[in-house]
């Protein structure tokens, strides 16, 4: 179960509503309870739902950071286009079939081959959830192997998300370096509430931010203040 907990590093530090927080906590509890009691197929279903939540949060970040690209990605979503454009929560994406929503990952350069691999996880979930007389995950070893596969996929999607996170962080630095003009005078508060909470950032997202190369902003008139803001993020969140 220790390896399974790694998925938590790809889920947001905090959520915009108590309902979202409660939902994620419920899924973790369902996974842990079923895993501990040997109900591995049900544990897999909960873990899959946590994984799809990660995907929804990734797509949400694309929507927020690159709205133009997101709109282009809506081609073929005629029935759901309005709802997706006006979405106020990542979970609005759940109205679209999981296999279909994965197409948005093309916006972060995931090719058809990779998306096909990710879609296989959805197929596995469907087979496990239907009353077909089969127990696909009857042993801990079987589920652990599937968790390893899922985490590889999640890590791969995270790697593809790096340009989106870097873009989001760059904009944050440019727009929030002045303590007199931002919402919170203290840099740590601004980072926590506006960058991390406001963008559903995860531990792995913040790891990307902490490695951001400030050289691309060296000519900016406020590079010193930008550097200070970045240093606070590194000091508060950098690991390893």
Predicted segments with their positions:
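Acidic-enriched, low-complexity/disordered segments with a strong bias for Aspartate over Glutamate
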Residues: 2, 29, 69, 80, ...
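Short flexible/disordered coil segments
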Residues: 125-135, 193-201, 231-240
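Detector for Asparagine
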Residues: 9, 34, 58, 112, ...
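A mid-sequence interfacial segment
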Residues: 92-107, 206-217
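Amphipathic alpha-helical interface elements
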Residues: 1-101, 117-120, 152, 159-181, ...
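Acidic, Ser/Thr-rich low-complexity intrinsically disordered segments
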Residues: 172-230
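Charge-enriched, short contiguous segments at helix-coil
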Residues: 18, 104-168
């Amino acid at each position: 179960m220790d390896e399974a907990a790694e998925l938590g590093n790809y889920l947001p530090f905090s959520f915009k509503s108590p309902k979202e927080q409660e939902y994620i906590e419920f899924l973790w509890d369902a996974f842990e309870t079923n895993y501990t009691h040997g109900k591995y197929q049900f544990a897999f279903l909960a873990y899959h739902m946590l994984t799809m939540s990660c995907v929804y949060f990734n797509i949400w970040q694309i929507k927020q950071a690159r709205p133009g690209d997101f709109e282009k990605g809506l081609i073929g979503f005629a029935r759901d286009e309005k709802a997706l454009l006006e979405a106020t929560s990542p979970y609005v994406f759940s109205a679209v079939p999981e296999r279909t929503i994965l197409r948005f990952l093309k916006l972060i350069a995931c090719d058809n081959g990779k998306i096909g691999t990710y879609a296989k996880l959805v197929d596995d979930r469907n087979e496990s959830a239907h009353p077909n007389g089969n127990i696909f995950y009857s042993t801990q070893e079987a589920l652990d192997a599937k968790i390893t596969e899922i985490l590889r996929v999640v890590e791969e999607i995270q790697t593809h998300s790096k340009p989106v996170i870097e873009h989001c962080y760059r904009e944050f630095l440019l727009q929030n370096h002045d303590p007199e003009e931002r919402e919170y005078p203290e840099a740590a508060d601004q980072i926590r509430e506006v960058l991390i909470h406001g963008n559903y950032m995860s531990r792995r997202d913040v790891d990307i931010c902490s490695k951001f190369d400030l050289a691309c902003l060296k000519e900016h008139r406020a590079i010193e203040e930008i550097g200070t803001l970045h240093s606070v993020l590194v000091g508060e969140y950098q690991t390893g």
